[in-house]
From Swiss-Prot:
It comes from Homo sapiens (Human). According to some authors, RPEL1 is a RPE retrogene on chromosome 2 which is likely to be functional. The gene is RPEL1. This is Ribulose-phosphate 3-epimerase-like protein 1. Keywords: Carbohydrate metabolism, Cobalt, Iron, Isomerase, Manganese, Metal-binding, Zinc. It catalyses: D-ribulose 5-phosphate = D-xylulose 5-phosphate. CDD domains: RPE.
């Protein structure tokens, strides 16, 4: 059974000129992992960074931090090997970006990374189901991918609930517009991993925000288990 409540800051809205220092601050503040958004300007209109930055972060931060790569790219097959060489831990690709998810899943595993599979708000969760037993994590987008600081889409929660019901041992991640006023909705629906960007990154005390999110998430998850 997927357990615990892991909080992963998204560095999308951080100062990219001081990215290493900001990531270190997040880890020192109690982050369970780092959520790194890779955008190519094709799959989504924005552009962020690629594997050279990930490789630099690994050298600066050491081997312990878990890098969850959210690959918002139109050719996810192209970047598996470079991200593996850069020592990414998990390669999360979008179901909408490939015609051969099974082949891509196999390639990611053969390159030594965990597999995440993401779906946009407009994609039915049932399309993810055939691959759920072959992946480590399902990412349910709660905003349209591509930019930070969007409003949380509560109508995505039935997707999370359906996945948790159908695949109880699967890690499920909510990503987009998640803060202290919305994290409980993700956890109550069944998410055990939460990505939060602005709520953490813009805070003068990120440790307190991370702890608050984790506590709210844990309480909501406990409530969910009692309500069964």
């Amino acid at each position: 059974m997927a357990s615990g409540c892991k909080i992963g800051p998204s560095i999308l809205n951080s100062d990219l000129a001081n990215l290493g220092a900001k990531c270190l601050q997040m880890l020192d503040s109690g982050a369970d992992y780092l959520h790194l958004d890779v955008m190519d300007g094709h799959f989504v209109p924005n552009i962020t960074f690629g594997h050279p930055v990930v490789e630099s972060l690994r050298k600066q931060l050491g081997q312990d931090p878990f890098f969850d790569m959210h690959m918002m790219v139109s050719k996810p097959e192209q970047w598996v090997k470079p991200m593996a060489v850069a020592e990414a831990n998990q390669y999360t690709f979008h179901l909408e970006a490939t015609e051969n998810p099974g082949t891509l899943i196999k390639d990611i595993r053969e390159n030594g990374m965990k597999v995440g599979l993401a779906i946009k708000p407009g994609t039915s969760v049932e399309y993810l189901a055939p691959w759920a037993n072959q992946i480590d994590m399902a990412l349910v987008m709660t905003v349209e991918p591509g930019f930070g600081e969007q409003k949380f889409m509560e109508d995505m929660m039935p997707k999370v609930h359906w996945l948790r019901t159908q695949f109880p041992s699967l890690d499920i991640e909510g990503d987009g517009g998640v803060g202290s006023d919305t994290v409980h909705k993700c956890a109550e629906a069944g998410a055990n991993m939460t990505v939060s960007g602005s709520a953490i990154m813009r805070s003068e005390d990120p440790r307190s925000v991370i702890n608050l999110l984790r506590n709210i998430c844990s309480e909501a998850a406990q409530k969910r288990s009692l309500d069964r």
